[in-house]
Structure formats: C-alpha cells, structure tokens
Amino acid sequence: VKRSDLEKAVVAACGWVEESQVVIFGSQSVLGSYDEASLPEEAIRSMEVDMTPASAFTTGADVTEKVSTLNVWVGEDSPFHLRHGVYVEGIHRDTVVLPLGWENRLVAFTASGTGDDQNYGRTGLCLHPIDLCVSKLIAGREKDHEFVGALIRDNIIDPAEVLDRIDKAGIDWSSGYPDNRDLAVSRARSWLQSKQAPAAEDYSDIARALSTVSRSHPRTIREHLRTNTSGAQDKSETAHDVGPDLSTERGYDLTD
C-alpha cells in the first residue's frame, strides 16, 4: 500500500460513513508517519486498511452499522477493492489492544485537496508507530514479528522505545481479550530484548591494569612482550636441537 492508496481508502470510507474522520489501526497506519519510500517492503505489503469511524471515540456512538457499511462498500471484494487494489476492513475498537493513552498520540493523515473539494479535510487518524508496534507484539503473530522486525532492522523503530512504552504507559486491554495478559506482555518484552544491540564490552579494567604495570616497572609493555616472546623462541630452538633424528636412527628417510 502507498500513501496514495491510503488516501483513497480514507476518502471513500469517510464518504460512506458520512464522517470527516476515521481511526486507522493495523499495519497501514504507519503510512501516517512515513512515506512508503522510506519503509521496508514488509511494512507495506498488506493491502488491507483496518479502520473504524471516529465517532466511536469522540461521542461514544454505536458504530456497528457503519462498520458493516465499510465492509460492504469498500471492503474485500467490493467494487472499490477491485478498482484500486486496496480495501478497508471495518473493525470495532474492542478487537484491538493498545498502550494506554494511544488516542492522545494519533497522527493525522489528511486527504489533499482544496476548500472547494468535497474530499477536503477527510482525515485518517493513524496510530503512532510506537503504539502500533506495541499492539503488534502483544498480538504476537508471525506476521506481526516480521513487521516490527523489519522496522527495527531498518532503524526506523528503536526496540528500547517500544519497551519503554510498554513499561511506562501500560496496556489498555480490551474487555474481550481472551489470552493470558501477563504472558502476552512477557513474550513481547522478551522478543524486544532479543532485538536490542548488545552492550559494548567494557575494557576499562584491562586498560587500568596495563597502566599500573607500566608505571611500576621501568620497562615498557612492549619490552615485556618482546622479552617473553624471545625467551619462548629460545626454549623452542633448544628443544629442537637436542631432539633425536628419528629418520637416521631407524634407517629410513621421511617421505611426503
């Protein structure tokens, strides 16, 4: 999916539900923050845009009928899908698990146009990329790990930031979440920790030890090493000189 595809989906969805805003969940919400050219292929592979009418959050309205409208008129196998190649999946908020406070960090993706354009001002409110990654990792499916892993690999997302969001914000669990919540968080944290770069090794103790030796002895470290190496070579040469010539004693020549 490209940003131009997302714009078409937002405009069409807003038109069908007669609202100026929709909230975009799922992987394609990352396009609210980044152009597709800066994203890895794994992040924009899906042609599905998960969304729900914004009135579900702004007024607490029951959007069941509007969600159904989205699925019929701009959903999978709809005329919109067949024409544009992208489709909308209308969802309910209680199917998504997100960090607490996610609604205060939404990124507005507004359709281009002018004040005279009927599509002007139609907006998709996209998840913040860090909140999106938390949601993906709590779900914990293979495709979710692939998505977040690609963003980390390309240095778009820092795993430490995602860990920090989990630990400091906490999780806004949906009432219908069926799985073990503690286990879901533990798995997400473990996966993120495995993606963090290993800490640089600390060689300060070795440096201090070498410094102490150099101060306490008049010879330099290089001289110490040269002396030790020379001694080892002398011993090796001596041992070779006194060794018996087995080929002579046994009366045969060594061959290749």
Which positions does each model-derived feature cover?
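Gram-negative host-targeted secretion-system effectors, predominantly Type III and Type IV
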Residues: 200-255
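Compositionally biased terminal segments of proteins
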Residues: 1-212, 251
